[in-house]
Structure formats: structure tokens, C-alpha cells
């Protein structure tokens, strides 16, 4: 009997829906990152991309605990002197609510090609409408 090694030929990908309404942003991101990596599968292989597809709905209704709603900033830098841009969390949630969850999940994935490929299977929507009804996703609590 030989050891099982996951590869593209024997990986079975499922579709899952996570509802972020009223739930902490970090807990939703952890659940999504685990599903994207395939850590909940018995066939998990660290060097192979064996995760599932994840749809996050109601990203605009995700909450932060404590005072993070007023104190948290999202920073980007152009690379030029004085090129730092800071956006408060509350303004980001008004303009691009799906970006806050995408940044959180990206930080929890590995910083290599496996993480980059896993992030491509993440679909985030600000409200309850999503486009992947044909895949018959399973709703997770």
C-alpha cells in the first residue's frame, strides 16, 4: 500500500457558501482560508492545491469586535516617497466591502503559488446575490 499524494487528477473540488452577516471578519476569513487550502479534508497535502471553492456573501455586513472599527486602517504604498495611502475601515466598508475580507483571507494563505492559486477560487459579494447558483454550493454556518 502506498502513501496517497494529491494532484490535479485526483482532487475533487466542492463549492461552499459562507454568510458573513453579523459575524466577525476574522472568523469568517479563517473559515474561508481553511476551505481554500483544503485543511478540512483527509486528503490534505501541504504542497498541493487541494482546496475547495468558497463564496462569501453579505461581506458588507461583517463586523469587527472592540474598537477596531474606528482604529483599523488599510494601507497601500505606491513605492514613491510620500506614496502611503491610508483608508479607515468604516470608509472601506462603504466603498469596497469585499476588499476587507479579501485582504484578511490573503494574509492567512501561504505566500507562494499555492496561496495565489487558492485565492483565485475565492468569490466575495457585498450582498446576498451571487452568480454561482449553477454549481449548487453547500451553505455552511
Regions found by a protein language model. Give the residues of each.
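Ribosome large-subunit tunnel/peptidyl-transferase-proximal elements
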Residues: 1-103, 113, 131-141
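C-terminal structural segments of small proteins and small subunits
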Residues: 102, 106-125
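Short, highly charged C-terminal tails/helix-capping segments
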Residues: 124-132
Amino acid at each position: 500500500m502506498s502513501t496517497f499524494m494529491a494532484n490535479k487528477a485526483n482532487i475533487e473540488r466542492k463549492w461552499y457558501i459562507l454568510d458573513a452577516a453579523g459575524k466577525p471578519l476574522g472568523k469568517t476569513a479563517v473559515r474561508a482560508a481553511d476551505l481554500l487550502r483544503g485543511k478540512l479534508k483527509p486528503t490534505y497535502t501541504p504542497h498541493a492545491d487541494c482546496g475547495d471553492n468558497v463564496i462569501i456573501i453579505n461581506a458588507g455586513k461583517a463586523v469587527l469586535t472592540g474598537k477596531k472599527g474606528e482604529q483599523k486602517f488599510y494601507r497601500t504604498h505606491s513605492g514613491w516617497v510620500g506614496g502611503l495611502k491610508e483608508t479607515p475601515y468604516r470608509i472601506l466598508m462603504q466603498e469596497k466591502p469585499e476588499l476587507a475580507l479579501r485582504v484578511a483571507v490573503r494574509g492567512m494563505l501561504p505566500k507562494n503559488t499555492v496561496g495565489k492559486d487558492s485565492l483565485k477560487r475565492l468569490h466575495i459579494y457585498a450582498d446576498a446575490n451571487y452568480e454561482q447558483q449553477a454549481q449548487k454550493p453547500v451553505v455552511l454556518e
